[in-house]
């Protein structure tokens, strides 16, 4: 009986360990973090990989990540390590997703809403977070 209980606890411990969220380092997916190279494509690829494996933590180590639209998805924590910065790309770089067509009067300007045309956004997502001691610098981004 004691062996059976011990076996059950071991299996339970292994199950808990296997479902813990995994870290995905954006540099492993091509991000440079030099403040000159557009890194949102690599960050979005990291988020997609994270989601494909059930979610987890997308980690930005120290560096400056020049970015257009970052698309957050369910079960993803975007974690900015100390010394990391997401820096909004200038609008002239055309690195942002297209604004949505008019879908009502809320949050619209000139026939467009601006959820997708943002630095960081999520649509129909849950369990999304941005954590850490890094910085997000919108640079006074305008459309």
Language model regions located:
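Extracellular/periplasmic carbohydrate-active domains that bind, remodel
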Residues: 19-143
């Amino acid at each position: 009986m004691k062996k059976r209980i011990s076996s059950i606890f071991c299996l339970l411990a292994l199950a808990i360990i296997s479902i813990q969220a995994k870290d995905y380092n954006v540099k492993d997916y091509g991000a440079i973090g030099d403040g000159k190279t557009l890194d949102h494509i690599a960050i979005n690829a990291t988020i997609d990989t994270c989601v494909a494996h059930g979610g987890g933590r997308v980690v930005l180590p120290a560096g400056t990540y020049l970015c257009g639209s970052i698309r957050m998805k369910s079960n993803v924590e975007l974690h900015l390590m100390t010394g990391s910065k997401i820096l909004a790309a200038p609008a002239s770089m055309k690195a942002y997703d297209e604004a949505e067509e008019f879908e009502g009067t809320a949050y619209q300007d000139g026939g467009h809403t601006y959820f997708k045309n943002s630095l960081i956004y999520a649509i129909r997502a849950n369990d999304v977070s941005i954590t850490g001691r890094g910085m997000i610098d919108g640079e006074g981004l305008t459309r």
